[in-house]
Amino acid sequence: MLFRSKLLKSDAIIQAINAASVIQYMNQNILKKYFENVLGVSSLKIRIGIDFGDDDEVLWSKYGIDNINEVTVTSLHADLSSKLQNKASENSIMVGENVFSYLQLPDDLLSDIYIKGSSEEKDYYIMKHNSFNYKMKNFDWSKYLERIAHFESYEGDFQIKCYYLSENERRIPYYSEKALEKDTDIVYQIEASQSLLHKINSVEWTVSNSGIEASKEEELDYVVPKEAFTDEDNAVFRCKRHTAFNGLHYMICKIKAEGNITKNKYFSLYVNDNDLSKSYLKKAELE
């Protein structure tokens, strides 16, 4: 998959992952039924490969005359994205090492594949060349979308919303389409009809962080302590936090309501320090 834009690098990768995941979702849950039940033919088998190359490892070229031209890219990572696509199984997404390292994706979204014809020997690398051993992972797009709170939200249920504060203290909704900067104040809130909110008996907020920074600080998973909430926070079912670590992080809200109902709601939030993430990139130094 090839994306070229003026977005921040983290946001370009995030939007590539989001686009690929939605493509797979639409194919698996909508197009498949149409092809098989209406058209009476086999459904599409979509394979997607995503990789990322930094500015100094990608050469953009434009060929042609006047308004008849073509933009093309030359890069090891453009070739690797094609190879990743070839490695992908039907209706799956393969990502290169720079993708999951740059965003510090959680381990539970990533898995190894097996060497073709073997059920025991894993295939870790999309490329092995002396000192340049470049890893690949299968990306669990289904689980990823399940944890994006607004993706399959519907009326009549509890919804988790997240807002971040602008410079003028205005609340802006966050939709997992980009990374927030570190030290950004954010607010999670349960939203639903008043009749549904009145049925809530208790709420527990659990932070699930990912990445090298959170691991070093031993703050990967923890329940937000009761003393972190004001009476007003508890009354309106909100949780105030701030961003601190690179990675894709989850807020997990456990809601207990009348009728012996328990629901666990996820919200996915990206945080990225692009300067730090650049140090995670694997550079090709081929002879």
Regions found by a protein language model. Name each.
Residues 90-287:
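Intrinsically disordered, glycine/charged-rich C-terminal tails and inter-domain linkers
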Residues 6-126, 131-135:
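Catalytic beta-strand-to-alpha-helix segment of the class III nucleotidyl cyclase homology domain
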